[in-house]
Amino acid sequence: MNKQLLSCSLKSGKQVTMVVASVATDGVDQQVEISYYDQKVIGNGSFGVVFLAKLSTTNEMVAIKKVLQDKRFKNRELQIMRKLNHPNIVKLKYFFYSSGDKKDELYLNLILEYVPETVYRVARHYSKQRQSIPMIYVKLYMYQLLRSLAYIHSIGICHRDIKPQNLLIDPETGILKLCDFGSAKYLVRNEPNVSYICSRYYRAPELIFGATNYTNSIDVWSAGTVIAELLLGQPIFPGDSGVDQLVEIIKVLGTPTREQIQSMNPNYKEFKFPQIKAHPWNKVFRVHTPAEAIDLISKIIEYTPTSRPTPQAACQHAFFDELRSPDARLPSGRALPQLEMDGPNEVSATGGDMAGPSA
C-alpha cells in the first residue's frame, strides 16, 4: 500500500511533496512517482479536505481530495471514479494513500483535474448583482449535467448528491463537469439503499417518504431543482428540515395522491396531509421565463418517479434547441463546447415525448 514518501523545501521556498501514486485508469496496475507543490486548502467538510496543488513536471493545477479510509472496506468513491470516462465528469488522474497523525490512521488521496468554478458560485454572483444568469448558460450547463447523468445511469451508477456545489464549470470554455462521487452507488434492483441521502433542497420526495428501493430518477429530480434554482435565483424548495422540505414541495406540486405516494414508497402507510392544490407553474417563475424552460421543469419535478424523463429524453427537449444551432455562441462570442450525444451509452432516449410545450 502506497505511503507518502517525502516533503521537502527547495531553494525557491517551494514546499514540494513527492509520492508514489497509482494511475487511476481502471484495470491498469501502474505506479508512478509524482511531485506537487503550492498546496493550499480550497474546501473541507465531513468527507475530509480538498487541496489545490501544482504538479511539478507539468505545472498543471490539480485538486487533491483527502479522505479518511476505513481499512475494513474498499473505498466506493475510488472504485466508481476509476470506471468513469466522460467529458462532463471530473477526471481522476492518480490516487495514493498516506498516514495520519494517529496510529493506524490511513488517508486516501484522490488527485483530480482542477476546474476553477462551480454553478453555485456563478449563480450566487448573478444573484448578488440582482441579475438573471444568461439563459444560454442555463441551457448549456443543464444540458451537460443531463449528459453526465445519462452516462453514469447507463452504467448503473446513481450520483445521489446532485446540487450546484457539485457542478464544476470552466467559465472560459463553458464546459461543466460533475464532481464528488462520495455518495454515489451502483443501484441494484431489489437491493435496499439508505434514504437519508442527497442534500436537502435537492432531495427527491421518495427519499423524504423513506423509500429504500429508489431508482436513478432521484438524480433527475435533483437536476430539475437545479434548473429551477438558476431560473429563480434561489432554491425552489428551501426546506428547513426533512418534513418542511416536503411542505415546500407540496406548496408547488399540491398534495400527492394516494397513488403517487404508493409510487414513491409502497410501504408508506400514513396519508394524513392537508389538501393543497398545485400552484400553476407559470406563476412559480418570473414573467419572462421561457415557456420551454417551464415545460421541461414541470415534466422533471414530478411526484411519480417513473413519470420523470430519463436524462437522454430530457436532453431532446425543445428548451435545448438553441444549443443545436450551428450559430450558437457564448456571450463572449466563443463557440460552444462540443455537445452532441457522442457515446454508445448516451444514444438511446426513452421516457416519452419531450418535444416541448404544445403550441
Swiss-Prot record:
Residues 330-359 are annotated as: Disordered. Disulfide bonds: none annotated. Its EC number is 2.7.11.26. Keywords: ATP-binding, Developmental protein, Kinase, Nucleotide-binding, Serine/threonine-protein kinase, Stress response, Transferase, Wnt signaling pathway. The keyword Kinase applies. GO terms for molecular function: ATP binding; protein serine/threonine kinase activity. Pfam families: Pkinase. ATP binds at residues 42-50, 65. It catalyses: L-seryl-[tau protein] + ATP = O-phospho-L-seryl-[tau protein] + ADP + H(+); L-threonyl-[tau protein] + ATP = O-phospho-L-threonyl-[tau protein] + ADP + H(+). The active site is at 161 (proton acceptor). InterPro entries: GSK-3, Kinase-like_dom_sf, Prot_kinase_dom, Protein_kinase_ATP_BS, Ser/Thr_kinase_AS, STKc_GSK3. It is an enzyme of class 2 (transferase). Residues 36-320 form the Protein kinase domain. GO terms for cellular component: axon; cytoplasm; cytosol; nucleus. It comes from the Eukaryota. One of its GO terms (biological process) is germ cell development. Phosphorylates oma-1, a regulator of the oocyte-to-embryo transition, enabling its degradation. Phosphorylates skn-1, preventing it from accumulating in nuclei and thus inhibiting phase II gene expression in the oxidative stress defense. Involved in mesendoderm specification and mitotic spindle orientation in EMS blastomeres. Thought to be a branch point in these processes as proteins downstream are not required. Negatively regulates Wnt signaling in vulval precursor cells and acts as a Wnt-independent repressor of med-1 and med-2 in the C lineage inhibiting mesoderm development. Monomer. Interacts with axl-1. Belongs to the protein kinase superfamily. CMGC Ser/Thr protein kinase family. GSK-3 subfamily. This is Glycogen synthase kinase-3. It comes from Caenorhabditis briggsae.
